[in-house]
């Protein structure tokens, strides 16, 4: 067993949020004499957001690196790749890794992320059935796109759309299957979803909504997808993009309180005062988190807490804005997408220019926004939603954006 110099910090996982925590700790001036990161992936932290750009051949793999090795040496941070923590002993305050290494800790942080959800379909174990989650997945998809022609992406959320567009850019014929009646149904209303579908089809993607697979067919290699209406789609590759679930098994085995994720308080502390969690593996109140922005906010909160910064307000989940670009079509969504009984809707659309907007207003406050095509006003709308600003003076011009409203005021 390795005896850590007290106090020692051990971090389980090295994704973007864990890396942000390390940077915040360094910037704040942490009290730890030793920081050790155990990472299940073969690579140190990289920009996971750019995986879709890598798949689409828009960036090089080297551009995904967040920090060079010299940064970790400079700040005396030890990173062990391909070595996930496999057991936590809270009473003894030590962890065991996949290699059999045992290490004592003063403070432990769980940043174990999330895993792709499976549908439990017959044939999911066939060769050619994949997920799109990490750099290893992306490398495999790039390789297969060089030797295969047809792909089916199951799931019309943002990850599925990014996978589909990346494979299309690599020259594959791609079909998107989505169970809901419109794409991005958690971020867009039906009108925006229909416009998005039309634009993707214009770019060469096949989009089937309101349908779902019942089986993946083939002997050893996947050869087709059977749909609920009996249709059979021939394919060489299937990408499952049907959501994620928090990686909580390690915490559960250690006796930590878990629900959908590892439960934490506003300081990102679990049911054990010496163990913290953040990012996709954690749950705060009823919220779990699939985007990097709240994870970065959690990293800032936890860094202040671990560095004992006074006046740390704690983590408060707000309205999370979704920003992405599919086939060069920018998309923004923040807040609710469906009007309530006391909601006023402001809506505009230019189908020919692939532009759509919806604003939801309640009691002179902007509560929700959807933008497709022209997202130049997204930062302003996002700030209005988060601040709860009275928009009475902008009511008749808010759809034209901040510069117009300021000039007209």
Language model feature labels by segment:
Residues 1-10, 67-152, 226-229, 239-241, ...:
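FAD-binding core/adjacent interface of flavoenzyme oxidoreductases
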Residues 34, 79-96, 103, 170-264:
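A Rossmann-like FAD-binding core segment of flavoenzymes
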Residues 140-188, 222:
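Rossmann-like NAD(P)H-binding beta-loop-alpha module
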Residues 141, 319, 391-409:
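Cysteine/selenocysteine-centered motifs that mediate thiol-based redox chemistry or coordinate metal-sulfur cofactors
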Residues 125-147, 217-226, 231-304:
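FAD-site-proximal beta/loop scaffold in flavoenzymes
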Residues 2-77, 166-187:
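Beta1-alpha1 glycine-rich phosphate/pyrophosphate-binding loop at the start
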Residues 16, 42, 114-116, 136, ...:
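Residue-level detector of alpha-helix initiation sites
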Residues 2-8, 27, 281-379:
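Mid-to-C-terminal Rossmann-like scaffold of FAD/NAD(P)H-dependent oxidoreductases
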